[in-house]
Amino acid sequence: MLLLAAVAASIALGSRAIPLRGVYDALTCPDGWPLTCAADGSTAQIVRELRLPRTGLALVCGLALGMAGALIQGYTRNPLADAGLLGINAGAAFLAALSIHLLALTTPAQYIWFAFAGALLAGVAVFGVSSVGGGKASPLSLVLAGAAITAFLQAMTNVVVLLDGTALNTYRYWVVGDVAGHDPSVFQQVLPFLIIGLLLALAAGPGLNLLGLGDDVARGLGVNIARNRALGLAAIVLLAGAATAAVGPIAFLGLIVPHLARAWTGPDYRWLLPYSGLVGAITLLIADTLGRLIARPGELQAGVTLAAIGAPFFILLVRRRKLVSL
């Protein structure tokens, strides 16, 4: 019910409030029948062409980032981990900025594939570097490799944006993180990757429960540790990479959402993963809607709104409750 309420509010509220009856008519009435509908032509255009694609993008990206955050915290055993820890955000940012600089791309629909490729390559690089030497990617080696690759990619991104003022202007809008102003094709481009990532994440849940007992115990119970970690990292890269490429790095979402979901489901990842996706979708929808209402008739980007709300909330969460050991 809360998800439906968040979706309805996202479509109905903004610089111009639309009654729910008007939203319903705009979605259901065929063109050419204005006399029988409460929605006029401009209302139908706002709902169908602006708010509905925006709401859909927020829904799927919030779901993806929430599930990716739960997976990252589980595999790294770090309750403060998110997509930035594995270099995914930095990889997406670097290739997005580089493509803007070299190819003069200006819209998210144009550079989304480069951002996704950057996230994918960064995730593979982190997994590869963390596996060097011991032959397996332990939680500690994943964190260290992610930190090193993130620092390198951030430095390269800074070089690109400082060399090109146009790239800086386009990049700084994307890097804030927002679901507004995206062509509907962006939703269609990322949806297949998000679906595949969702299925991989759900498949990785049972094995992740056993990995939480320790590698030796999990191995004794018959878990193929390398295969399970590879499955989980593939899900993380697809979910977080596609969502970040589409809307930019959304701060705090992948960090806070798993803790909220864990309060309802407990540590069982078979339930934690879908609930994290549900809470992530609701959270991003609410943040986007609040951003439209707070600065009306303008708006605040969802990334700014979520950071402003999420930072004090997370501090309160840490002070009132001890973080669950992962």
Where are these regions (language model features)?
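Alpha-helical transmembrane segments in inner-membrane proteins
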Residues: 1-326
